[in-house]
């Protein structure tokens, strides 16, 4: 055994599994990059005495670990990674940035049609199809963001949008179904959120009313403050240190 006061395996893959066999088990913290459906995840489910804590990136993921994998609540802690608090000055050149990830094309088409009906200009980014610098430029130039997103265990890109001070109208979803009916659980595309971030709706029939409210109070949102208060590097480090202790 290698002797350390704390042992932290951020990602649990073949390399981490090998490392795991050489460290003190009673101080071992694992996650949040854990996939309980693979061989290494199954090992953690079957050997709960081999680690002190498993980390979930958000509350709904913790609930999934408990309710679908029968992991004890006292074994699971929630820790989101820190988000940079950008010191940007917004340079607005168009109305809406559409952020699209793992949703149906017809939902995207409905949003585009809605924005067209309001004579609003928009640009779109799709997950996996952008570079970091180009993404930040598009975010900084947008008056607001329209989020059409699948479930997120944390939602780092979304939180970077918030951190740049861009209000969001989010077409949220209520369940995680990625692994089929047996693992259906309540979930969300915005696991870190409060009223400072923007507005949320779940059904296309709610869009018109929600959007009217969003536009009427657009200048009152402060997503940058939400990130600073909840997901800054300082907040993230404090939470992690509390878990390690």
Predicted features by range, described:
Residues 145-146:
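A short hydrophobic beta-strand element within the catalytic core of glycosyltransferases
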Residues 137-142:
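Short alpha-helical donor nucleotide-sugar binding micro-motif in glycosyltransferases
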Residues 213, 229-245:
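C-terminal alpha-helical cap of glycosyltransferases
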Residues 153-230:
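Catalytic binding pocket for nucleotide-activated donors in carbohydrate/polymer assembly enzymes
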Residues 150:
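Aromatic "clamp/platform" in nucleotide-sugar-dependent glycosyltransferases that forms part
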């Amino acid at each position: 055994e290698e002797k350390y006061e704390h042992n932290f395996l951020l990602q649990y893959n073949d390399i981490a599994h090998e490392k795991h066999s050489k460290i003190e088990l009673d101080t071992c913290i694992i996650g949040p990059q854990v996939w309980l459906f693979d061989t290494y995840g199954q090992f953690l489910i079957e050997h709960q005495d081999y680690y002190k804590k498993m980390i979930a990136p958000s509350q709904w993921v913790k609930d999934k670990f408990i309710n679908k994998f029968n992991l004890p609540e006292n074994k699971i802690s929630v820790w989101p990674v820190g988000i940079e608090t950008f010191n940007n000055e917004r340079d607005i050149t168009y109305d809406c940035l559409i952020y699209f990830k793992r949703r149906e094309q017809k939902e995207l088409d409905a949003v585009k049609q809605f924005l067209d009906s309001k004579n609003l200009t928009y640009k779109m980014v799709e997950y996996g199809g952008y570079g970091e610098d180009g993404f930040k430029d598009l975010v900084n130039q947008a008056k607001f963001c329209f989020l059409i997103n699948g479930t997120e265990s944390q939602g780092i890109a979304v939180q970077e949008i918030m951190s740049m001070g861009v209000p969001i109208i989010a077409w949220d979803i209520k369940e995680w179904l990625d692994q089929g009916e047996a693992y259906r659980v309540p979930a969300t595309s915005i696991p870190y959120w409060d009223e400072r971030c923007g507005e949320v709706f779940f059904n296309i029939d709610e869009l018109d009313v929600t959007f009217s409210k969003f536009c009427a109070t657009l200048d009152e949102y402060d997503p940058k403050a939400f990130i600073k208060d909840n997901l800054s590097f300082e907040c993230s480090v404090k939470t992690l240190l509390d878990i390690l202790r």
